[in-house]
Structure formats: structure tokens, C-alpha cells
């Protein structure tokens, strides 16, 4: 059984990253943060019961910039990504997403990212909590694969709940309605560039917005989504 601990204050340490949406989560009343992928993750706001019912009956937005992206591109990006993941990516088309595993040589799970295929030889891994970029660079170093590994300036935001589809259609138009489960589309909003995916881990219908140029546009997107959801 997990032991309950008394809540404590959070001290924001400069060696741990702030999300591009951090100021927005502060303004929204975030009461606690945890550290995930070396970045602060808002854990709860005013009332956890209210947040649960908002998710299951309405629509919520979440700062999940902690799902940091590992970008794999280059002539051998497909071969390399197909090697390090457990999915057969021959069955993954461009603009399709896959939930997959990264394993060590003994089959132990290193990470369980959601993979997005943006082009024939361009992939993003939206990772859970471990240093996948360093691990992948180690595999690629002095190897047979011609790949470039990096972390793009991208920050995911989740839009989840039974009313998420209506909200997304009101913002992005009817093209969102036809987006299949675990597929993606590139789009723009008020000069902001982003990848929208029909993904999420809530058990409710939902989407994720992968904002490009997130350091510049993070608060702009956050405020845009809040205003649209009123």
C-alpha cells in the first residue's frame, strides 16, 4: 500500500525546466507540481473531485509538456526507429500514431512512448519519464544508421473529455471531426503551427496538440484554448 504523506511547498529549482505553459498553470491556480522528465508537471489545481467530474462530463486542458519529444530524422530514420521500438512500423503510415515500447537487451521496458510518423523518415517519440534521447543517441553513435536525434521545440497539451470534440471543431473546423483514432494532422491557429493528434490516456475521447515553437507561443495557445472553452 502506498503511504500517504503530508503536502509540502514546491520550490522551483532552475535546473528543472518550466513548461512553456507554466505561467498559464500558475494563473489557473495549480496547487502542486511533480517532476517528470526533468520538468515541472502540474498535479492538481483547486479540487481533485471537481477536476475528475470535469474530465468525465465536460472538457479539460492539461499541460503535458513533460511528454518531451525525441525527434528521429535522416535517411535511416525508419530503420532506426523500427529497430528501437517493439511495433512493426511497416504497418505505420505517415500521419499515423502508435503506442509502443522501448526495451533493453533483456526485454526490460525502458519507456512507453506514443510514436507519431510525420514523414517517411521523420518520427517523434512522445516519451514517458526516462532519458530516452541520451539512450537513443548512445545506440546511434558510431552505428550503421545515418540518423539525426534531437529534441524539437514542441510542447504537447491535452484536450480531453466528452465535450473535447465539440471544442476542437469550434477551434480548428470540421477537419478535426474526421481525424481517426491515433492519427495526426498538421494545422495552424492564429499564426501558431502545431500537430493535432487523436490521442490521450484518460479513457475519454480526446486530443493532443503538439505546439511547435512552444517557447514563443506556449502562453498564447494556453490562453486561446481557455477562452474558447468558456
Residue ranges and their predicted role:
Residues 63, 112, 208:
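Acidic active-site catalytic centers that drive phospho-/nucleotidyl reactions
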Residues 1-37, 41-43, 116-230:
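Conserved, structured C-terminal
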Residues 68, 98, 111-112, 145, ...:
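Residue-level marker for the onset of beta-strands and adjacent loop->beta junctions
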Residues 1-102, 108:
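Acidic, proline/glycine-enriched N-terminal capping motif
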Residues 48-57, 102-112, 141-144, 188-196:
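Short amphipathic beta-strand starts and helix->beta connectors
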Amino acid at each position: 500500500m502506498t503511504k500517504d504523506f503530508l503536502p509540502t511547498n514546491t520550490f522551483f529549482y532552475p535546473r528543472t525546466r518550466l513548461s512553456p505553459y507554466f505561467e498559464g498553470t500558475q494563473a489557473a491556480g495549480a496547487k502542486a507540481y511533480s517532476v517528470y522528465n526533468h520538468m515541472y508537471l502540474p498535479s492538481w489545481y483547486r479540487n481533485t473531485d471537481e477536476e475528475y467530474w470535469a474530465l468525465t462530463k465536460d472538457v479539460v486542458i492539461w499541460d503535458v509538456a513533460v511528454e518531451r519529444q525525441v525527434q528521429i530524422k535522416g535517411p535511416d530514420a525508419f530503420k532506426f526507429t523500427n529497430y528501437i521500438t517493439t511495433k512493426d512500423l511497416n504497418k505505420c503510415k505517415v500521419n499515423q500514431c502508435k503506442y509502443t515500447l522501448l526495451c533493453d537487451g533483456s526485454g526490460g521496458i525502458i519507456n512507453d512512448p506514443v510514436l507519431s510518423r510525420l514523414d517517411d523518415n521523420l518520427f517523434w517519440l512522445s516519451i514517458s519519464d526516462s532519458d530516452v534521447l541520451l539512450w537513443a543517441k548512445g545506440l546511434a553513435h558510431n552505428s550503421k544508421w545515418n540518423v539525426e536525434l534531437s529534441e524539437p521545440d514542441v510542447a504537447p497539451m491535452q484536450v480531453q473529455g466528452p465535450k473535447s470534440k465539440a471544442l476542437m471543431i469550434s477551434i480548428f473546423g470540421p477537419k478535426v471531426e474526421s481525424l481517426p483514432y491515433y492519427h495526426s494532422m498538421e494545422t495552424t491557429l492564429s499564426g501558431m503551427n502545431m500537430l493535432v493528434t487523436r490521442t490521450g490516456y484518460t479513457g475519454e475521447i480526446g486530443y493532443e496538440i503538439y505546439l511547435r515553437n512552444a517557447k514563443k507561443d506556449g502562453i498564447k495557445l494556453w490562453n486561446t484554448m481557455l477562452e474558447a472553452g468558456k
